[in-house]
Amino acid sequence: MTLFDEEIARLDVERADLAARAARETNDGRRAYVDAIVARVERARATLAAAAAADSGVEKPTTTGGDGARVHARDLTPRRFRLEYVATDTPVVIEGLGSALTEDGADGETCAWLTRRAGNKKVAVTRKDGHRRATLSCEVTDVLDLKDFFAEVVDDRGAGSYLYDTSIPLKLPSLSESVRVPAYVAHDYMQRTMRLTAFSRSWPSLFVAAKNTRSSLHVDQWQGHFFMAMVRGTKRWTVFSRESLAFLRPSWSRGTLDPAMPPLEEQEEMGMLPLPREFGARRWDVDLGPGEVLFVPGGSPHAVRNLDCTVAFAGNFVDDVNLDRVLEDLKLMAAKDPALMESYRALDEVDFDDEGAALAAGDDDVHAGAFDANARVVRVADYLAGGRFV
């Protein structure tokens, strides 16, 4: 039995279990939600079956490449970013923003801004590498002052500890004066609705991690694009194309639209499934360092390892490229959880009508003269107001 055959057999069992679960569901909305999950299992199975039938001697999945593109911010306008990377589902690292990502300019990497503005704020910290697996909750958490946690990880006393995806606007609002959001994502549709959504104040969010911690191989909820701005340390990212999902041993048994997957390092040890290029499957590996910003296309599975103590902020965003997929998932989520229906309606009711601007080729603010990194960032208040989009 090949690796493909093993996965197909596992998905057959999973599909039968989920179909039975849907048949037992008495609530129409929740049944529609589970039916949608069943359809995703079936798509993954069909992809694997087609790949197994093709049996084309596909290469081992180690593609990195001009694939993992890097470009300096001086040469990349927001319009060009959207045309060349977002619209083509291509991950990219944007360099040269280190002096503009925080209020401390070129000294931002020391993170004095972090302890000065929010050092006495209580934060919930995950222990024992709790984000390594794609579970719905982390078992061990502590609550402590942010300055104390930061000192722990800097001094290498916080092994396995992670402050993960903590909303700055909601949980650490004083940091809203400290960080700057890359202008490349300031067109976020979630910030341009007439009514607030459940996600309007979720980002940017803060990540502070101890050396050697990991985040699980996962797909972000509702197909959101993702950005991360690195302030301190280095994260090793592995990003897969959206079409790679079926080849990463996805499991929908937990009953969510976004599947769980075994940790990347475990899959590599047991032998990863091939990533056939003819099916659009691709892998990118990249180290993200201080002053750099990473874009991950919506729906792309990804995993992260912190090579040392790291500080970063990040967020999801929506634009014309992933809007339809986001609305599809939000509508299904709202069928299961009616509280999300207002978020779906708030996003669906707006005619953003800026596709032409998004795909315009006019890079008219690339200058031959001195480059000012501050021209490529916006303040959090402007980002949340949706008033500084390109």
For each of these PLM feature ranges, what is it?
Residues 2-293, 301-390:
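N-terminal accessory scaffold of Fe(II)-dependent oxygenases
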